Amino acid sequence: DPSDKSATRKKLTREQVLQNCKEYQKQASRFISFSGSNKALLKFNSEWLAKMNFENVLELASQMTVDQMLKRDMFVRRTEENKPIYIHEFLYPLMQGYDSVAMDVDVEIGGNDQTFNMLTGRDLMKSLKNKEKFVIATKLLADSTGVKMGKTEGNMVSLDQTPEDMFGKVMSWSDALIIPGFEICTDLPMFEVKQMEAEIARGSNPKEYKVNLAKEIVK
């Protein structure tokens, strides 16, 4: 996935992908049930993508134009910086978009870095199934440079970290992340978050709010 990447991603082996999947499912299982009568389903898109032949890929590629792809902000930045854009990166939004078609979804939820990919799926759903698909894009926590926090960037707080490490990582965040951190990573009511934002703006010491944020995240 080239989303939000200034350079091509490092290619992973299938074994690495499967191992990452196990880790993500393990972390997600703290919030989502993968067993029982109403369990969440975990699907590999190889279930349908592996069945596609080259004719199918060409047919799918005919649903979008190069101009549409080049309007993507990440590709615009690469072009301006004279960095390469590979064909497989062009194909990725189509492949992810086709996941929606294959599963016949009604709604897709993802981080706002996935908006282009999810809207590609919406367009494909319209053209291939004459069906509307709704997209919900959620905020992502970004560091002081505007780069989203994640595994690739090495600046995330992992659910697998010890409470001490999680606390320390949050305390290392810039003050600008305090309010977004409360909004995105805690269950505090928004009126309390807005109140803290106003207090910080009036000159209150941000450190005490950051300590409270770290406690909320760790608990």
Summary of predicted features, one role per range:
Residues 1-11:
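N-terminal, positively charged nucleic-acid-binding surface of large information/translation enzymes
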